[in-house]
Amino acid sequence: MNIYRTHVCNELGVAHVGNEVALSGWVYRKRDHGGLLFVDLRDFYGITQLIFNESENPELFNRMATIGLESVITVRGIVAERSEDNVNASIETGHVEVKVSTLTVVSEAAPLPLHVPTSFSYPEDIRLQHRFLDLRCDKVKNSILLRSMVVSELRRAMEALGFIEVHTPILTSSSPEGARDYIVPSRTHAGKFYALPQAPQIFKQLLMVGGFDKYFQIAPCFRDEDSRADRSPGEFYQLDMEMSFVTQEDVFAAIEPVLYGLFAKFAGADKKVDRQFPRITYRDSMIRYGSDKPDLRNPLVISDVTEIFRNSGFRTFQAGVEAGEVVRAIPAPNTSGKPRSFFDDKIERAKEFGARGLGYVTYEADGTAKGPIAKFLSEDELARIRSAAGVGNGDSVFFMSDTADKAADFAGKIRELLGLELGLIEHDTFKFCWIVDFPYFKCEDGELDFCHNPFSMPQGEMEALEQQNPLDIIAYQYDIVCNGIEISSGAIRNHRLDVMYKAFSMVGYDEQTVNSKFGALVRAFKFGAPPHGGLAPGIDRIVMLLADAPNIREVICFPLNQTGEDLLMGAPSEVSPAHLQELSIALNIKRK
């Protein structure tokens, strides 16, 4: 027999009335009603109300009155039915209470640094220093429970599709995947270091070369990155998957039902899940949404109106177009009647984003075009703008002119701002999309580099690398975006060694360097590599979306703070000189 409890705190009901029970848990709330002390006892499963009667047992009553909230106690007593006017329908045990006869204090709590029921409203540093208390809050606990259920469902879905779970190494070698590595010094190989994997990229490709057909794992990934709302510094987890003998279409067909089913199961009754996964090219996404992570809940679509302004009378934009700039149009429905302050505010916000300014035209109820730049445009140009932007009478159009990348960024931010301010966002919906056809290369400071994953296959393979302008080459790379959050990246991999050597040579890596950095992959590709591809949905981001959490740290059990510190465990921390000497390490700290 369990000496601490016969039942858990969500278990008792009217069927147990008259039974003697034992319960253990934390003191959640206390209410003194003059001779009757009501205590809510909470455990992992729920809450049960306890009653201490001063007239029946004053010693027990007084002892309980002195016990602080969040202390752990064990009680024994008789289950009693509540009167009808005292029923609490908000808890599972709300029809009964326990009249306590014995009380044992298992662990008394010190004065609390935060109020557990509302811990999520406290400053983050206090919460993280006392995360063990924060986790007792239902809102926080439920996010962690949701994460557990999501992982379980993903594992079930992948196994049902015939995927095999394989755990790949945590200690490995450094690889260029776009972020800084966490490195681990080797004691037995002085001066050498392991790296924590940014992703199991090479290992899963080696599994495919090793003859495995479908692989997955719930993979920990480690990247020394700065924090964002949708990115936690340090580590994160992803559903890593790879398939052999597949095309891009096969990968899409495998993952779409998994993600739709997951969101449909856990979205909740108040959220809809759009079954469609529209495909948007990277180029179209940057033009139409100003981002490669578009939020399709926002119906506003940006238009390219560069050619309309090429020979227009609005000299500011015309000169920019002549210099190679572009002009983007952002529609603003039902705003022509807004006060001047509405438009001035958008201009100021654009400048805050870094733009030089923002033009606009309003189309009045009678069809008349007004606004600061309307007088510089012909009737034909105004009509073409109206058509391109998809607006009508009563609407307005904002204009952004700059280089293509800056215009996309600024226009995208104005689109997002208008969507929120005009109440256009479908907050009760999850909307997915694929972003496809990413550029294979990019040019920064005159140097060619990989745009995303260096291990992806260029569309056109060797012919593309040899005959096309490098900046025109498209990769078999793809992202999944949900509500403006990138939840997965993937690619069809480059399984041809000759194509791999050629691609790396174009960004400055000779064969010897490639062999040195990716020796395992190079050797494997010499012994029969199948075409393969995959992707890796981010579990933290998926749970953040499903939980409607304000940032990713809310769905991680023991997160680092925004500066990469573990306030609970005191990491990162200094190590002893003896430990450093054992690792053959001498510190040379840069002073800020």
UniProtKB/Swiss-Prot annotation:
Q: Which InterPro entries match?
A: Aa-tRNA-synt_II (IPR004364), aa-tRNA-synth_II (IPR006195), aa-tRNA-synth_II/BPL/LPL (IPR045864), Asp-tRNA-ligase_1 (IPR004524), Asp-tRNA-ligase_1_N (IPR047089), Asp/Asn-tRNA-synth_IIb (IPR002312), AspRS_core (IPR047090), GAD-like_sf (IPR004115)
Q: Which reaction does it catalyse?
A: tRNA(Asx) + L-aspartate + ATP = L-aspartyl-tRNA(Asx) + AMP + diphosphate
Which major enzyme category is it? ligase
A Gene Ontology biological process noted in the UniProt record is:
aspartyl-tRNA aminoacylation
Cell compartment(s), UniProt: Cytoplasm
Which residues are ATP-binding? Answer: 223-225, 486, 538-541
Q: Which amino acids does the record list as binding L-aspartate?
A: 177, 223, 452, 493
Q: What is its main location?
A: cytoplasm
Q: Name one GO cellular component term.
A: cytoplasm
- Assigned protein family: Belongs to the class-II aminoacyl-tRNA synthetase family. Type 1 subfamily.
Describe, as the record does, how this protein assembles with itself and its partners: Homodimer.
Q: What is this protein called?
A: Aspartate--tRNA(Asp/Asn) ligase
State the organism named in the record: Anaplasma marginale (strain Florida)
Q: Which gene encodes it?
A: aspS
